[in-house]
């Protein structure tokens, strides 16, 4: 190895002075070596043997070879560290970095075999920042929006519920036009009833597939018709209303049969005047709500089925959203 420091500066630092006196001091130590000095090495001999065994051509290693290699490696590392420390002092730092060792390797020819092992430019690949997008599906509560306008009236109902199906549709009826609901799978024959002059109400009752639905009108039952009026102060007033035989028969036909079956109804209003009708089907447990419009009024029918074997009243409520001119909005209760 070279014995010259290779520095031309007049004012030498401590590292440069140590490097200049390095090889004379090493040669003096080698001449004064004894057998006892080879027993203790600064570098572990097991690691030196492991490096030597990496060569496939090496079959056997003598006892003296690791000792000599350990001493040579110690001298080599000391010289390389001194040359790298000079570069550290030139940059006015007190910490030895990998870049300092790379600069020492490139400046001196005896370290050329380390250029591929210790590259000069320590380039770290940029880390790729992957954006993780999480789509949180909020809960879908049941929301109903009712919109009431002037004639022709339009009532729109929108509902969403997880695990439950709610259908909403809007139909426009022209004067003299008749619309018949298409029976779905499991529905019985539509029942048509005359309610008022120039107005027809058609009720279609649906039943689960494979089950028979029988509409029976209870004999001996008394029907009491009440008018429900909501005042400006929010109070609810009930006034008895007289209905003809045809309307009472229509109410009896609309009532469900006692049992555990759930009845799902569709109501369509056929009017001669131009109006818009909203059909809403909401099935919750054993309760069913149906809504239809008549002119500027919104009617809501609630049907409740009771378990079989219980002799309880089966109410059916028909209530209006606003009060007409004659002040008669029927609410029908079946006892």
Swiss-Prot record:
It comes from the Eukaryota. Its main location: nucleus. Gene3D superfamilies: Histone, subunit A (1.10.20.10). One of its GO terms (biological process) is positive regulation of DNA-templated transcription. SUPFAM superfamilies: Histone-fold (SSF47113). Keywords: Activator, DNA-binding, Nucleus, Transcription, Transcription regulation. It is found in: Nucleus. GO terms for molecular function: DNA binding; DNA-binding transcription activator activity, RNA polymerase II-specific; DNA-binding transcription factor activity; protein heterodimerization activity; RNA polymerase II cis-regulatory region sequence-specific DNA binding. It holds the Pfam family Histone. The keyword Transport does not apply. GO terms for cellular component: CCAAT-binding factor complex; nucleoplasm; nucleus; protein-DNA complex; RNA polymerase II transcription regulator complex. Component of the sequence-specific heterotrimeric transcription factor (NF-Y) which specifically recognizes a 5'-CCAAT-3' box motif found in the promoters of its target genes. NF-Y can function as both an activator and a repressor, depending on its interacting cofactors. PANTHER family: HISTONE-LIKE TRANSCRIPTION FACTOR CCAAT-RELATED, NUCLEAR TRANSCRIPTION FACTOR Y SUBUNIT GAMMA. Belongs to the NFYC/HAP5 subunit family. Heterotrimeric transcription factor composed of three components, NF-YA, NF-YB and NF-YC. NF-YB and NF-YC must interact and dimerize for NF-YA association and DNA binding. This is Nuclear transcription factor Y subunit gamma. The lineage of its organism: Eukaryota, Metazoa, Chordata, Craniata, Vertebrata.
